[in-house]
A protein has these predicted regions:
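Scaffold/interface architecture of coatomer-like assemblies
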Residues: 19-310
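Bacterial N-terminal signal peptides
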Residues: 5-16
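N-terminal secretory signal peptides that target proteins for export/translocation
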Residues: 1-2
Length: 310
């Protein structure tokens, strides 16, 4: 009886197939909304949060785009990955850094959107996810208090892995990296870390604690690499010493996150580059305003290749 039913169903399916199948017509439509988190400042570094949609002009690979999404002081929920360097080089400074991180997380989760969440990572020669995304400050703070310094610095691995997790989440993606310098033990390299962050639409805010102001005692190469990572994602690098300057850096990050514009467009007519990377440029009227946003994004084919492991 079952075989008879299957046979009748198969016959019905075959009957629905034309005797001479027509060639398929493939229509490709780009429906991806490209979102940009934008910070605007004046020449004194003051945040400007009063601009309107018509004040912004966007170019994708040199082609002007139509703005389809605009939010001033966006309340899109934040997913914030906090990466703490616990390598041996952090030494006695680590406890001061952790105190400032704790204050930052308390303020972040206590203010703003009640859907904001944080995740906590530590990294030395390996990367450890200490707390997945949560709103429970006590849970994250407890993990912070247990951190100790030892080992090397897998900075790029930490950025790469945290970006992969952020890519799966809704809302705004932010990564705050507390470190004292450059990478020493990662499997991933600088370019892989940057690409992962850009694919995840993640703003990088490296906080490079530099108790030594003389270049001779600092990892200037590591600082330059993180400055480039921040600029490529639309974030900003901070170089505080300990104490009040470190607390001020975290306060500045919070202010920027609360004053961001969210601008989006559906790409049209933008020529593709060989690596599928689209360069973005966004401008606002007036010579005294500076726009901070990510340098670009990867096209769909690049994302598909990455996700399939090719």
């Amino acid at each position: 009886m079952i075989r008879q039913a299957v046979g009748l169903l198969l016959a019905a399916v075959l009957a629905a197939v034309p005797a001479h199948p027509q060639p398929d017509t493939v229509i490709r439509v780009n429906v991806r909304l490209v979102r940009m988190l934008v910070t605007v400042k004046d020449t004194n570094g003051q945040l400007i949060g009063s601009l309107n949609k018509n004040d912004f002009t966007i170019f994708d690979n040199g082609v002007k785009q139509d703005i389809a999404l605009f939010e001033r002081q966006t309340e899109q929920p934040l997913s914030v990955a906090v990466l703490v360097d616990t390598s041996a080089s952090t030494g006695i400074e680590l406890r001061y850094e952790l105190d400032s991180v704790s204050k930052f997380l308390r303020a972040l989760l206590g203010e703003g959107n009640p859907r904001d969440t944080v995740a906590l990572y530590s990294f030395n020669w390996q990367v450890n996810l200490l707390s997945s995304y949560t709103r429970r400050f006590a849970r994250v703070d407890q993990q912070l208090k247990q951190l100790k310094s030892e080992g090397g610095t897998s900075l790029y691995d930490a950025i790469y892995l945290a970006s992969r997790e952020l890519e799966l989440r809704d809302g705004r993606h932010v990564m705050v990296i507390v470190t004292d310098g450059g990478d020493t033990t990662s499997v991933k390299d600088f370019h892989q870390a940057l690409e992962a962050a850009q694919l995840a639409d993640t703003l990088l805010y490296p906080v490079l604690v530099v108790p030594i102001t003389n270049d001779a005692g600092r990892n200037v190469g590591g600082e330059n690499a993180l400055t480039t990572l921040a600029a490529g994602t639309g974030g900003r690098v901070f170089l505080p010493t300990l104490g009040a300057e470190l607390d001020r850096a975290f306060s500045d990050i919070l202010r920027e996150l609360r004053t961001q514009y969210l601008v989006g467009f559906y790409p049209k007519d933008a020529p593709l580059t060989k690596d599928r990377f689209h360069t973005l440029k966004i401008s606002v009227p007036g010579p005294n305003l500076r726009v901070i946003t990510r340098s670009g994004y990867y096209g769909e084919s690049s994302e598909s290749s990455r996700r399939s492991g090719r």
